[in-house]
Regions:
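Noncatalytic, solvent-exposed loop/strand surfaces
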Residues: 1-386
Length: 386
């Protein structure tokens, strides 16, 4: 915590100057009173912010979708509809609007709110994280939506969907993605019943749904939910399924889905499936027809995007929580041991380098302006290009 006035366990989003890492401002939120059922202790913020047109959008630990002015209060202005921030110093965040998903749509987050926002046009999309209660049996809020769309300027609710209903296996921690498939702008999100669904981006009309579990998987512990973010590539949707990392390792599945189909496309939309993979919470990276897909057991799989043929598998020897980055002919991937491996892109396995950051790497590297930014559990690094 950079502000000595803020003490104790909190969820905090910090802003730093890109050029030299100087701390600028932070958005600090107290933990929810309900405790670990909604807001697991000492886990901070699990949402990655989206930056667009001078605004940072993210989901706080309190289940709020928040829009923040990137300038904070350093510009001498209190922007937006929220004017009652408790502190308005230059190191405080300037809140433009907030949408409380617990209050407004009745969401009941399980353990953490974990969605990273995505935008399309005037709308912003997030998962509500609605899930089971502490019993891991009951759904306290079965009518709450799984996905919502808000006006990104005002925070007004535009549409919602609850196709999951009361079939949530555990929690809902995936993030939506947006893509144009067959000429139709779609919002796509994996959900807590193990199904992935696609919606018309503007209206929220459900276009299709696909079950990522074998039909003989009928009991909750034999079905995987979806935590990763889907990727759209050449009119196909790619995603791997998994479970809460606390459940450990297990059998997973990865799919290529033809999302030009409609309604239940579990059979008609399946292009290929890849079963030699363990449970995964990672989003694939796709480059020049090759998929780089990690699993939670520590393996990185290189797969042909058209056929599902596997070219190689690299063992990192540690659990993988984050997702790979492909840039300049290289694949970057961190693991729970704090190692970051760099591999050459292509159908032949070649490890270029490996370094250790001193503590676990749970996030995904981000490139910008000739540098690579990545964080370990307790540090943020900016690495210069060679």
């Amino acid at each position: 915590v950079k502000d000595p006035r803020q003490q104790g366990d909190m969820g905090i989003l910090m802003a730093f100057r890109e050029s030299d890492g100087e701390f600028l401002w932070q958005h600090a939120n107290a933990k929810l009173i309900a405790g670990r059922v909604h807001d697991w202790p000492y886990q901070g913020v699990c949402s990655s912010p989206l930056i667009e047109d001078g605004v940072a959008y993210y989901v706080s630990n309190r289940g709020e979708v928040v829009a923040l002015d990137l300038e904070g209060f350093r510009d001498g202005e209190n922007d937006g509809w929220v004017q009652d921030e408790s502190s308005q110093n230059e190191i405080d965040a300037d809140v433009i609007w907030r949408f409380d998903m617990l209050e407004e749509v009745g969401a009941f987050p399980h353990n953490m709110s974990n969605s990273s926002p995505v935008t399309h046009g005037e709308l912003i999309y997030v998962s509500t994280a609605n899930g089971q209660d502490e019993s891991h049996v009951n759904i306290q809020s079965p009518f709450a939506p799984a996905i919502i769309a808000l006006n990104k300027t005002t925070g007004e609710l535009i549409w919602e969907d609850n196709s999951v209903d009361d079939r949530i296996l555990h929690g809902q921690w995936a993030s939506p993605t947006v893509g144009t498939i067959g000429g139709v702008d779609q919002v796509i999100m994996g959900q807590g019943d193990g199904w992935i669904r696609g919606y018309e981006a503007t209206t929220g009309e459900k276009l299709w749904e696909f079950d990522t579990n074998p039909k003989d998987s009928v009991w909750p512990r034999t079905r995987n939910e979806l935590i990763a973010t889907a990727v759209v590539y050449d009119d196909l949707v790619y995603i791997a399924n998994g479970q809460d990392p606390e459940h450990g390792e297990g059998v997973g599945n990865m799919y290529a889905i033809d999302a030009t189909k409609r309604d239940d496309i579990t059979e008609t939309g399946r292009v290929w499936s890849y079963t030699d993979i363990r449970r995964s919470i990672s989003t694939p990276a796709i480059h020049e027809g090759l998929i780089y897909q990690p699993d939670f057991s520590g393996f990185l799989h290189c797969i042909d995007a058209k056929t599902g043929e596997v070219y190689w598998v690299h063992d990192t020897f540690a659990a993988i929580w984050g997702s790979p980055l492909v840039v300049d002919g290289r694949v970057y991937l961190g693991d729970e041991d704090g190692d970051v491996v760099v591999l050459k892109t292509g159908s032949e396995l070649e490890v270029i380098a490996e370094m250790n950051l001193g503590s676990a790497v749970y996030g995904t590297p981000v490139p910008a302006n000739g540098a690579l930014f990545l964080n370990s559990r307790n540090r943020l690094f900016a690495l210069a290009a060679d």
